[in-house]
Amino acid sequence: MQKDYQKLIVYLCDFLEKEAQKRGFKKVVYGLSGGLDSAVVGVLCQKVFKENAHALLMPSSVSMPESKTDALNLCETFSIPYTEYSIAPYDKIFGSHFKDASLTRKGNFCARLRMAFLYDYSLKSDSLVIGTSNKSERILGYGTLFGDLACAINPIGELFKTEVYELAYYLNIPKKILNKPPSADLFVGQSDEKDLGYPYSVIDPLLKDIEALFQTKPIHLETLTQLGYDEILVKNIISRIQKNAFKLESPTIAKRFNPK
């Protein structure tokens, strides 16, 4: 198993280097939240680009203090250059103007603010924006369109969350980050498990079977329950996948009009 993950690390580092070169970039930038996914991406980027891999820390007015602490600790441990841009003043303005905004609206606004800061830094420093969303999030649509899902390339987008955990172990990610509950940190008390209803240890095996069995076919509830999955779990996951499938699609462009 260790040998497989060492090969994966080499593969992902090679991906980052080649894809950046292909696009004409020598520097990269990514958002570092203090969570697992961005920590893994940060360490991979540091291995490839050294001082040319830059992390942006972008806490909001509701970010947990330990998120910033964990991000700073990672930067110190792995010698990662970083800049902090607080988005708190901006999300406070949004909250004051839209007092009835739901937590989801506020969270999406913060995610898109961070995207704006990343792409502004990208332009200023001639750096390529690196994504940090894992495959579980992408399949479930558990992310903000044109927010945390926005990037130029993504080294972990084909790794399920449970696989990211395993990779993080071999990258020597600090235990504090490894052991804390996954959270987008978009509002107080948020956690992935609360939002999704299940831990990734339960969700990922189902997602893998869905991918293996229904790549080009409609997903069938009965097939999955016959494999032993709980019916409510399967219904919830299928509903989320179908509802959010558009987030993985490129914008649909009308075909060129040719008058007869």
Curated annotation (Swiss-Prot):
Gene3D superfamilies to which the protein is assigned, alphabetical: HUPs
Domain of life: Bacteria
Binding-site positions, deamido-NAD(+): R112
Family matches, as SUPFAM superfamilies: Adenine nucleotide alpha hydrolases-like
One Pfam short name: NAD_synthase
Quaternary assembly: Homodimer.
Protein name according to UniProt: NH(3)-dependent NAD(+) synthetase
Species this protein is from: Helicobacter pylori (strain G27)
